[in-house]
Amino acid sequence: MNSNSTIGRTTLGESDTISLSFSEPSSSLNSRSTDVVFASTSTLVPQQGSLTSLPPVSSTATPTYYSTSLTYDETLHTSIDVSSTSTLVSSTDSSSSSEQDTYSSQYDPATSSYSIITPSMSIFSSTSPMSSSSSITSEWSSLTSTTPTLSSSATSLSSSWSSLSSPSSLLVSSSLSLSLSSSYSDTKLFSFDSRSSIFSPSTPTVISPSYTYLSSISATSFQISTTSELSSSWFSTISSPSTTSNKDTTFPSSSRNTSTSFYSSSLSSTNDFSTISKSSKLSPSASSSTVSISTISVPTSSSVSSSSSKVPSNRPSSSSSSDDTTSAYSSTYTFQSLQSTTSSSIPPTTQTPSTSTISTSPIPTSSQVFNTVAISSSEDSKTIYYFYTQTYDITDSSTTFVTGLPTTIAVAKSEVTSFSAPSSTITADMSFYQHWLDGSLDNNKNQGTSKTNTGTIVGSVVGSVGGILICVLVVWFMLVRKRKAKRHFKENDSFCHEIGRRTGFPTTAQAKEASLQAQDSGSQQRNTETASANNPFSNEFNFKARGNPPPVPPPRNVTAMNGSFQNMRSNFMDQENRFSYGSSFTYSSLGSSTQGGFSTLSSNSIRLGRGLDNDISHDERNTVQNNSQGFLREII
């Protein structure tokens, strides 16, 4: 019989401050954190006819690691201030006669701030991909009978990864400010030589970093190789002491873990480095952490929780209990991994052994394959209704399961003689399944969709034909209008209509009409004669209406003109060939036509120009031909 008693209750306030500073030129090797990308697939198969059945979980995860290494040889003056404050609010101790003590404490939110100032720094960085592949397989089997039976399960986990990076160059400017704030409670249970701890954060941790770097780097390299192996096995014995449905199951188990880490780095440094630091170390048994992840999906529910602690214990334990309807088991694996030290010019930090505890709660298998489809029918005067179960593959981002949903199809009697249900599986999303559960899924939406599609097709065809006709009419109208415009331009703007207009008189066609009207009546003839005095083109083709030629003018006295004419002839004879018309009408022809005292045309032939007449010698003619050219030579 155990008796419990409370020892005491205390309220303490604790404050811890860490400060690091150095201001000498330094050279160091830096490695950034690793980014991990997981690609996982899980499958849930529910039981037919039940939306809350418990299907098995099969999960495969393939993570990919991307590591960025920073290597730099820096010459800088850096100051680092680190402060951390934690306050113990309450503490309670209790003990029992079975030599078991319970200790619990609660802390208020703790805040840690880091400030790093680096005036000048050059960074050569390179990114090297690291690949990792891990597989977790969970097997579960059970057999229930009145005699003792055996149920076994095995879980194995293995992973390995390696990395090799090479430097590259990068020049950036940054500064770093990091703040961490969280509030947590701590509960401890310990007895004799074992101790466990659970750390549950009540508020999320807030980290706000900002970087400013300006550095100069030398090339370095490092290599990481890690091999991890986890194996476990256990056996169970099931006993049925009575005919009742409850059963007790105990799983003794053993686990084994092997972890190997290798880390090597090299760097070159030519500067001295000094560090003045003050730090506080928390023992491995003083804190622990628990991370819980809960996943709920329709129509099944499952929960997975994992916890990690720093308790250096390697004694696993497991227990299980089951009844007729549900079964679950819980296993705890404890393994310890050691990390190797770092080789660099910076003093290495203290490596703390870490221990991880994984707790899983899988659910029993439940699978159903829809091989046979039962069809029932109902009919009225015109329609036959078929009822059957359609297989659906419901797929979501985190869940995939197969289920059967009742489906109804209405077919006219005149269109079908026999009916067979489709055997293929239809793939749908979770929203479809949710609508089916809510009763808001319209089974006749396909018929409405077909009618809508028919109307859309008819409207598209009619619109296309109408659009083509409208385009043809517009093109025809433009062509007709252009043809009329060309015809109007030919009638009004042709060359024949411009002949009379350029002299200020009507066109030739109007003159023809006027001459014909003048021949019909005397009055019109008089009007035409009056108009002909002003318009020389009015009687152009009326030869009968033309009058007699004008009388010959009286003769002129040319005696006094002979002297002046000879002078004028001699003065202008040299310039007679300046123009082309001088060769066809010369003063010699003018003189011959005016010697008789009349101004009429002479009967002599036209003079060809000086040097071409018959009254000059052959030598003079050649000389004149060489000095000037006449009208005929110009034409040739």
Curated annotation (Swiss-Prot):
Protein name: Topoisomerase I damage affected protein 7
Biased composition, class Low complexity, residue ranges: 19-33, 87-108
Annotated family: Belongs to the TDA7 family.
Residue stretches of biased makeup (Polar residues): 1-18, 510-541
Residues in cross-link Glycyl lysine isopeptide (Lys-Gly) (interchain with G-Cter in ubiquitin): K512
Source organism, top-level taxon: Eukaryota
Organism from which the protein derives: Saccharomyces cerevisiae (strain RM11-1a)
Keywords: Glycoprotein, Isopeptide bond, Membrane, Phosphoprotein, Transmembrane, Transmembrane helix, Ubl conjugation, Vacuole
Transmembrane segments: 457-477
Glycosylation: residue positions: N4, N257, N492, N557, N562, N626
Localisation per UniProt entry: Vacuole membrane
Membrane topology: Single-pass membrane protein
GO CC list: vacuolar membrane
Phosphoserine PTM sites in chain numbering: S628
UniProt-annotated stretches for the region Disordered: 1-33, 87-109, 238-271, 299-326, 339-362, 510-551
